[in-house]
């Protein structure tokens, strides 16, 4: 019997073809079409507190946020929009519920876009004509943001609960009202707390229209739970080519939402990777404290912008192989660490010097990469 070893003949399945969608401008950020998938977040400050809101927007911008949303539940908040929109370094979307008058206030204030919730704005259907005319005159797109928790009562009566079909019908109905007034500068979201329902709703929507889609799992929960839900839902849809902009909803500081959203895009190859740390989960073979080592290396390299892969490995099983695959890596054991740079062992250091040596080598490689402008194959750091 002949046994042939080698790679499987079937190629890896690529991500799905990007869904065709019309393109809109949210300020200076393109959404839809062939534009990169953008990352959004939402301020947790009182919008009426202009300074606090602008300070949080600055933090979000520094973390990589491209579009920010602010809540407008009161007249004081509406009055603050002009100053915020004027001074914000990234496009500002006004989030409107209940009162249609705030939609007009947001447009007049110079917001880059307005999100409306058709499920709870008073007499919304009757106001669509006025909203469409005002938004069209100002060049302001409208996001029709359908949420499971505030679905129109007529649809709840029809479907019994917030099903994928109910969410989709709500969005398409409101789109049709805007279309009657020749307004199509629209993007849509159909959010649900259950990732499975959310995925099904967006699939239906993607087949039914060509508007750009804003992905989100509403009320996703605390940081860990919300990260898992969003990663599952966004990963499934983006892998199918569905989704043009994302917002990870977490019961956590908004900057954390941006970090998670960016990481999801990077993991799918939809955003150029920066620093990536790969580490093993540890086991009885590990001869170093992998957790501490990985955390120390990660902290020491935080903020690095170049696409560097660093591998921190704790034993001799996968350690040397993983380290060789990375730009920089360490394979640890017997109180020592072998330092690999682009596949070659360059030195062996005592365990106490591993972190310091890795950081020094990473900084040196980063300077080289920045100088010659040639990124590595993939930015990542591996710890195993």
Swiss-Prot record:
Cofactor comment: Binds 1 [4Fe-4S] cluster.
UniProt EC number: 1.17.7.3
Coiled coil stretches, renumbered: none
Catalysis: reaction(s): (2E)-4-hydroxy-3-methylbut-2-enyl diphosphate + oxidized [flavodoxin] + H2O + 2 H(+) = 2-C-methyl-D-erythritol 2,4-cyclic diphosphate + reduced [flavodoxin]
Binding site for [4Fe-4S] cluster: 280, 283, 315, 322
Record pathway: Isoprenoid biosynthesis; isopentenyl diphosphate biosynthesis via DXP pathway; isopentenyl diphosphate from 1-deoxy-D-xylulose 5-phosphate: step 5/6
Keyword hit for tRNA processing: no
Obligatory cofactor(s): [4Fe-4S] cluster
GO biological process: isopentenyl diphosphate biosynthetic process, methylerythritol 4-phosphate pathway; terpenoid biosynthetic process
Enzyme class: oxidoreductase
Keyword Nucleotide-binding (UniProt): no
Any one GO molecular function term: 4 iron, 4 sulfur cluster binding
UniProt entry keywords in alphabetical sequence: 4Fe-4S, Iron, Iron-sulfur, Isoprene biosynthesis, Metal-binding, Oxidoreductase
Record-stated family: Belongs to the IspG family.
Function, as annotated: Converts 2C-methyl-D-erythritol 2,4-cyclodiphosphate (ME-2,4cPP) into 1-hydroxy-2-methyl-2-(E)-butenyl 4-diphosphate.
Protein name: 4-hydroxy-3-methylbut-2-en-1-yl diphosphate synthase (flavodoxin)
Naturally occurring in which organism (per UniProt): Frankia casuarinae (strain DSM 45818 / CECT 9043 / HFP020203 / CcI3)
């Amino acid at each position: 019997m002949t046994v042939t070893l080698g790679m499987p003949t079937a190629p890896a399945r690529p991500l799905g073809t990007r869904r065709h969608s019309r393109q809109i401008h949210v300020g200076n950020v393109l959404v839809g079409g062939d534009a990169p998938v953008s990352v959004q977040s939402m301020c947790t400050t009182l919008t009426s507190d202009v300074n606090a809101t602008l300070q949080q927007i600055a933090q979000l911008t520094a973390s990589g946020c491209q579009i920010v949303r602010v809540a407008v539940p009161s007249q004081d908040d509406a009055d603050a929009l002009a100053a915020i929109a004027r001074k914000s370094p990234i496009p500002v979307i006004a989030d409107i519920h209940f009162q249609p008058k705030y939609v007009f206030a947001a447009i007049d204030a110079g917001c880059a876009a307005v999100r409306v919730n058709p499920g709870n704005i008073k007499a919304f259907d009757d106001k669509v004509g006025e909203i469409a005319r005002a938004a069209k005159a100002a060049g302001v797109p409208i996001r029709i943001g359908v949420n499971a928790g505030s679905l129109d009562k007529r649809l709840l009566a029809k479907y019994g609960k917030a099903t994928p079909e109910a969410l989709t019908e709500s969005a398409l109905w409101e789109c049709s009202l805007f279309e009657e007034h020749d307004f199509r500068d629209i993007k849509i979201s159909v959010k649900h707390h259950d990732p499975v329902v959310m995925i099904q709703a967006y699939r239906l929507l993607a087949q039914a229209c060509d508007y750009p889609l804003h992905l989100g799992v509403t009320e996703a929960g605390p940081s860990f739970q919300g990260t898992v839900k969003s990663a599952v839902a966004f990963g499934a849809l983006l892998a199918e080519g569905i989704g043009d902009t994302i917002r990870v909803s977490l019961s956590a500081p908004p900057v954390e939402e941006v970090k998670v959203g960016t990481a999801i895009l990077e993991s799918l190859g939809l955003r150029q990777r920066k620093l990536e740390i790969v580490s093993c989960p540890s086991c009885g073979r590990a001869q170093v404290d992998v957790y501490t080592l990985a955390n120390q290396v990660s902290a020491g390299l935080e903020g690095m912008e170049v696409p560097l892969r660093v591998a921190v490995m704790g034993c001799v099983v996968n350690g040397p192989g993983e380290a060789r695959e990375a730009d920089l890596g360490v394979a640890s054991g017997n109180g020592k660490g072998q330092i690999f740079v682009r596949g070659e062992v360059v030195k062996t250091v005592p365990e106490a010097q591993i972190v310091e040596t890795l950081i020094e080598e990473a900084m040196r490689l980063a300077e080289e990469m920045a100088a010659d402008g040639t990124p590595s194959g993939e930015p990542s750091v591996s710890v195993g």
